[in-house]
Amino acid sequence: MSENNENDGFNLDPDVKEELEETKSEEDIIGMYQTDGSNSEKVPVLKSWLPDSDKWQAKTVVNEREARLMAVARNLTEAYDEIEHMQPFIEGLITDLEMYKTSVDGMAREQQKSVLMAMFGRSSEAQESQSMLMSMIAGKQDNDD
C-alpha cells in the first residue's frame, strides 16, 4: 500500500502512517475518509481502528432519539483521550443535530405542528386555534389600516 499512498500531503500521526503502510490487504480497509479543504484527499479507514466486535455497539441500527447515545457522544473525549482536540467539533455536530430534530427556524416542532394543524383544520382544538389565528391576523390587518 505504501507505493500507492494517496495521503502523503495529509498530516497524519507517525504511528497512523506506519499502520497504513503495513496494511497488506484490501480486506483490512473498511472505507475511505474524504478530507476537506483545497487538496481533498482520501485516507483509508482500517478495521483495526474499530473496537472489538463484542464491544462495538454501533453495529446495529441506532435510535437517534436515545438519550444515552447523546450522552455517550458528548463524552467521547473522556473515553478516548486521543480525540480530545475534536471536542468542539463533536459538540457542534450534536448541537446541530439536536436543533434539527427539535426545531424549525427556532420554533419547537410541536408548536410548528400545532400551527400547521390550525391552518389546515385537523381537529376541534385545531379549529379553535385556527379561529384564534384568524382573529389575530384580522386584528393585525385592522391595526395596519
UniProtKB/Swiss-Prot annotation:
Disordered, as annotated region? 1-25
Q: Which domain of life is it from?
A: Viruses
Biased composition (Basic and acidic residues) is annotated at: 14-25
- Its name, as the record gives it, is Uncharacterized protein ORF18
